[in-house]
Amino acid sequence: MKWSLMAFIIGFLMDLLIGDPHGFPHPVVFIGREITWLERGLRRIFPKSPGGEKAAGGLLWLVVVFTSTGIPLLLLGICHRISPWLRLAVESVMCWQILAVKSLRDESMKVYDALESGDMEQSRHAVSQIVGRDTSTLDDAAITRAAVETVAENTSDGIVAPLLYLAIGGAPLGFCYK
């Protein structure tokens, strides 16, 4: 457990300093691809009925949670057998990838800076990078509201909940949450 606690602290500090570099492979992308691939296959196997979709959804959930938790657990076990220091390094990187402190701050500050400069087009573009809605007609109040809502939601999804899961069960439970 002490290795997971050290990895938790190192991963958190890495996230504060580095954030999510563009182009760096992110495990959540792989989890999303796994979901898409499994969903396609399960739709072919299970009937298109409420019961079939419920069964397919349950199986999908089970497989994704199992692999998202099991792969990190297995990888950390292998690393620990080689060297506890290797495990610390790998789990630190895993913890770093689960968190979104710096990236959330950086992206939301782009909205703030654009609003402060009075550039509505840049403000709309900046907020469009963090929300899932059409921003082309938003005024400054609506842009501010959209940014605040997104920051509040993503603080829960990308910072608070992952920190809780990482603190309880290390990177494997953090990936289980994701």
Report residues per predicted region.
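Hydrophobic alpha-helical transmembrane segments
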Residues: 1-175
